[in-house]
Amino acid sequence: MYQVIKRDGHVAEFSLNRISSAIMKAFDATHIPYAPDVIDLLSLQVTADYADKIRDGRIDVETIQDSVEAVLQRAGYAEVAKAYILYRKNREKLRNMSSTILDYKKLVDDYLRVSDWRVKENSTVTYSVGGLILSNSGAITANYWLSEIYDEEIGNAHRNADLHIHDLSMLTGYCAGWSLKQLIQEGLGGVTGKITSAPAKHLATLCNQMVNFLGIMQNEWAGAQAFSSFDTYLAPFVRMDKLSYNEVKHCVESFVYGVNTPSRWGTQAPFSNITLDWTVPADLAGQPCIVGGKPMSFTYGDCQPEMDMINKAFIEVMIEGDANGRGFQYPIPTYSITKDFDWSETENNRLLFEMTAKYGTPYFSNYINSDMEPSDVRSMCCRLRLDLRELRKKSGGFFGSGESTGSVGVVTINLPRIAYLAKDEADFFARLDHMMDIAARSLKIKRTTIGRLMEEGLYPYTKRYLGSFDNHFSTIGLVGMNEAGLNANWLRKDLTHEETQDFAVRVLKHMRERLSDYQEQYGDLYNLEATPAESTSYRLAKHDKAQYPNIITAHEGGTPYYTNSSHLPVGYTEDVFAALDVQDKLQTLYTSGTVFHTFLGEKLPDWRAAAALVRKIAENYELPYYTLSPTYSVCADHGYLAGEQFTCPICGRKTEVYSRITGYYRPVQNWNDGKSQEYQDRKTYQVSGAAQPHAAAPAKEVKETAPVSGNADRYTLFVTATCPNCRAVKPLLQKAGVPYEEKDAAQYAEEAKALGLRQAPTLVAWGEEPTLYVGAAQIKAFLREYAQ
């Protein structure tokens, strides 16, 4: 006899009497007479209706109840079916009432005794009274989301582990990127009843404001907070005060220590990210610098020497680590690797790649072969939403976000379960569509909810500096593509096999197409993410093993977990290029956070080896983000130790072993059971003997600036109401005497769409053929030629 999976995940033996009893109650409610034989016949028809849905000797109670409704309808008992539906709704209300009651004693005891896996759900939250407070409030908030905000189907999908709704413990959005330029122009404050700081005039003041800003915003968001163009925007402050290198380093040091102070809820440091340009970006080079909230007489393009000082100081602080030699967890820096990147043996290059080799700190954005542009981190608010089916790519790094963008929430789909339950590939996609529909609806509900709460004043600083969530994505991710291949009865192979790789490509393309549908349906931005899944990969596998004992997880016979997103099994190969060849065709299909981690057993021999590997990956692959991730250890007395050493070889004391868990470094002792098992299973890549990449990426076309149209009859400037670059180019056009007509792209959407506009500002020169100057940089290039 088979078993029934209840809504709370518990399993009970099947009983035909329970079906018969429910049907009789529905008949009694309608006062329609019935014979016992009729009830028996209907009950048997119900079991026949769901028979083909039984998997591994189990079926969920919702499927049985759906069959009861269907059988009653087909048998002509429409009124009885209505009564049964009402019976289900009443039962739902009772469940919802009971689900809002928390066992406070168990909640606190489980945390204090570390008997609940959720105590280590997030490795950044240490066992502490702050962690206890977060655990208690998080349980209440999660209950509120699942019982009071989301409908039963969404709540059940999460509780039953069909999918995972992230950050239920917070009544906030997920992650956000902020405009550092806005903070420099406007200062910190502007919220009623709170202290306001004027725009910073000195680097030390700005560093303090950034620390405070990130700490404030972290309390209004669940995940990462990001600044873009960190080095570019800070450089003018060095120039204005003619600061020495030691003075610059002292300011940067105070910033780094400040953002690593556990000032956030849960005794955590703010999850902070910064992108560094390394060289002045073209779209900023000609803009006047802002210091003290006012434009200066010099431009960002004049400040490359000061940028070099900022970068040198930041890297030296990160390399030195804290007083015990421990690497700094934050901020997570992302560096842009462009075609023009200078690979020569400069001092800053040596420092950058020494930091990479020793601590694995930076992320690298691949602008050589990927379809991204460095200016993307600043242009999101300028993008025109004319084609609702166009999927945009989130900028700003794996965890970070570009200026004024981010994500309202993330939902991860449990792919191995779908594959395990599916009869064939067609059934797999039907089930995937259903789960994605639930995920998309939950994200729409969350967006609406937090949008209303922001208007009501729950997130005062977000309201002040952001204003709306219009440029924030609704994010859908996935976990366990590797195990989906193993559980799919038409494959039975993991991602190391070409058949499963081809299947993964079909799945990712199908999910992208589905996201375009949701953008049309809901009018919001959606993106596809390779979810970090720090705890999700463990939670979903743990649930699946309890409900479906024969399902295949990443570690059979031990602690179960699923492989992150569409990554290869962690113990597959030591050949980094063999892994890259497979991942390159998969990671380029995501439109949100995705990264290739080059896990290394210990630090590389020198900085040149790190630089060579970073360059080789960027020049030969198209994947957007990657890291070098060496394992290292820290002894309280003897500091940094290369590689995994659980005891100090000098004094024999217990050490902290650091590795990258999902995207950031934490001691492996703090990891949850699933990720700890993954760490044990993981093979590290051998680089010293690595040959050339197995597959070289084709060269990309270089985007050319539009030629100046000298015989234009007229000009039209397309703008948006919220675009800062639009406001910047208008006075430049007027000063140059360009006779232009201004049009709001939203009001003239059809005309803008016909011209193929994707970004504001865009200047159209009308001649025999319209010539487009897209973005502030191209418009400024046009003006230089126009003046001649």
Say what each PLM segment does.
Residues 1-106, 468:
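Charged, amphipathic alpha-helical regulatory modules used
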Residues 90-94, 100-470, 491, 497-650, ...:
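Conserved catalytic cores of very large enzyme subunits
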Residues 705-736:
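Local sequence-structure signature of Cys/Sec-based thiol-disulfide redox active-site neighborhoods
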